[in-house]
């Protein structure tokens, strides 16, 4: 039963059985299920991928099967899944669905990632969306799990941190929703670990990402309904940017931005750190760029000032682009570590202050008013607002030059992909899309829908 394309499911489950490696099961004997039950849960999890994608994008095949309404989808550019606890207490979790949607390949080959947040966190979903449309790269959804100080690491492992990790690091760890591209198995021309735009990834890199990932029976103490969790270790040395959109009553959305790097630890040290939480979840160690003052005075200060236990993290140092985008949307940025010479805000910001620019951001955004209307408890972006942002991005082609340089190549890649899979994947297709979203609740799942404006 269920509303999905059974023919595509057959293709998907065959691919999953061949390419997804099932790792060890660490459940206690009393919580361990039979192999037949794990097989059924694996099949159910793959069906969840199809259903979530079709809910977002639609699928004309469903109309042929008699499900005309469901075939339309919601034209969602991003989405999320609450899961805990109403769903996961009695059904398999979303920890296969979420990372596969966020990854730039599946049984149909390479494709654009589908922005998908876990735990119904619309704010982190929006952060992932902003990161995605600015970089054209898939994102990590992570818990800000733990700050590990140099003293704590040495006490529990005997290892002395050095290099970028010398002042400590953040353990970013969540059981699902982190893209499999974050393994760091993709490489640039110099052999450095990267997360590539989807059209650049090779078949060899897809295989390497999959080899570096294992799927494990979910911890029944967290997920009584079962399912699977994803594990890999993110390669060190990658420049990354963490962001977080928070909502403040009476103020609205506010943004945090932090550039930094991933780091690696010796295997035995990493194993000890992983065992303090859950060793079967994705492992990413993050060090923010420290400034010696404010929220970036130390790694601990970064964690203490972060607005939630979730963060959206993407490849590259693109904090300046996020700050510029936030100014267009009238979203104040109240914490960042981007060097001032890289930041471009509208000149109209100057009369609101030149010394304390974070405070000036709040005054300017209040004066110019945030570009949205309010419908009930939902923040809805107006078409005029999106058109304004699109025009502003056009005026800032130099700032966003790297994105525009990929337009022609991306269009060709999308056309090839559409021809290969025989369906519209609702990809960017040569358009730079500025997307701002409103949260819509449907069937217990948070869908982030948006108006779009293409500007090429």
Where are these regions (language model features)?
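Generic multipass alpha-helical transmembrane bundles of integral membrane proteins
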Residues: 1-5
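Anaerobic metallocofactor- and corrinoid-dependent redox/one-carbon enzyme cores
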Residues: 6-35, 45-368
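Charged, low-complexity amphipathic helices and coil/IDR segments
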Residues: 369-456
